[in-house]
From Swiss-Prot:
Source organism of this protein record: Nitrosospira multiformis (strain ATCC 25196 / NCIMB 11849 / C 71)
Similarity comment: family membership: Belongs to the ATPase gamma chain family.
GO cellular component: plasma membrane; proton-transporting ATP synthase complex
InterPro entries in the cross-refs: ATP_synth_F1_ATPase_gsu, ATP_synth_F1_gsu, ATP_synth_F1_gsu_CS
Subunit-level organization: F-type ATPases have 2 components, CF(1) - the catalytic core - and CF(0) - the membrane proton channel. CF(1) has five subunits: alpha(3), beta(3), gamma(1), delta(1), epsilon(1). CF(0) has three main subunits: a, b and c.
Name of the protein in its database record: ATP synthase gamma chain
Primary site of residence: membrane
Described purpose of this protein according to its UniProt entry: Produces ATP from ADP in the presence of a proton gradient across the membrane. The gamma chain is believed to be important in regulating ATPase activity and the flow of protons through the CF(0) complex.
Subcellular location: Cell inner membrane
């Protein structure tokens, strides 16, 4: 009976854990829907500012912004790694960090220096443990991040590129595909590639040539637009990463709940067999005693 009591305690413990994982699954599902809405709402702004940046980069040929200039040699690289602040989201953080570390090792093998900006507690902790050169970070941003809290961290890299401290800047994050699929990606953030701007020179359905009147002059306007555009790219990546995080957490908690159910079934079967064996033994002892009398 001591064995049966121990099994009952295990069943009770697993059931309590299952209640927690089911609650976390429902919370993650609710947060996932809100994160997807924020992700969709951020896209129109990104598209509009990309249209403006694309046109201005072509229309005003007297000035070429540093973000558009390709460096002859690449010796110093800045990377932005976007992860979650919390765990229990499957392999989401592991996959993007594995990709980042793989690229970092390849660059270091070529003699390139790497400096890191971390967005998210998980990435910051990992990079600090591996001894990476972390120059800035933004953590505990919550499920609805404010761009203002990001600017301080990413401004260090943007200013560094302007000052020739970096030759390239890359962005690592998890792209949201659908509820069941998210994939880690690496994108070149700076210099801005033609692929990013090529399709955005003119809005769909609009004809004719754009022309702007700059007040007081074009250079400060272009400088500001380019910075805002890069910030929009990073913010869009962050919203996709949050949507991916909540989706991965919902799937992970559902899997945990299902596994808990399987464990409960197995323990219940073991308990029933143990109880049956104990009853059979008692009956055998009673029958044996009666026969002896």
């Amino acid at each position: 009976m001591a064995g049966s009591r121990e099994i009952r305690n295990k069943i009770k413990s697993v059931k309590n854990t299952q209640k927690i994982t089911r609650a976390m699954e429902m919370v993650a599902a609710s947060k996932m829907r809100r994160a997807q809405e924020r992700m969709k709402k951020a896209r129109p702004y990104g598209e509009k500012i990309r249209n403006v940046a694309a046109h201005m980069s072509r229309a005003y040929t007297e000035y070429r912004h540093p973000f558009l200039i390709e460096r002859d040699t690449v010796k110093r690289i800045g990377i932005i790694v976007v992860t979650s602040d919390k765990g229990l989201c499957g392999g989401l953080n592991t996959n993007v960090l594995r990709m980042a570390v793989s690229k970092m090792k390849a660059w270091e093998a070529e003699g390139e220096q790497i400096e890191v900006c971390c967005i998210g507690n998980k990435g910051l902790g990992f990079m600090n443990r591996m001894g990476a050169n972390v120059i800035s970070h933004a953590v505990s941003l919550g499920d609805a991040p404010d761009l203002e809290r990001l600017i301080g961290a990413i401004k260090i890299l943007l200013d560094g590129y302007n000052q020739d401290r970096f030759d390239r800047v890359y962005l690592f994050y998890t792209r949201f595909i659908n509820t069941m699929k998210q994939e880690p990606v690496m994108e070149q953030l700076l210099p801005l590639s033609d692929e990013r701007l090529r399709a955005s020179d003119r809005p769909t359905g609009q004809r004719g040539v754009w022309d702007y009147i700059y007040e007081p002059e074009a250079k400060p306007v272009i400088d500001d637009i380019m910075v805002r555009y890069v910030e929009a790219l990073i913010y869009q990546a962050l919203t996709e990463n949050i949507a991916s995080e909540q989706s991965a957490r919902m799937v992970a908690m559902k899997a945990a709940s299902d596994n808990a159910g399987n464990v409960i079934n197995e323990l219940t079967l073991i308990y029933n067999k143990s109880r049956q064996a104990a009853i059979t033994k008692e009956l055998s002892e009673i029958v044996g005693g009666a026969a002896a009398v």
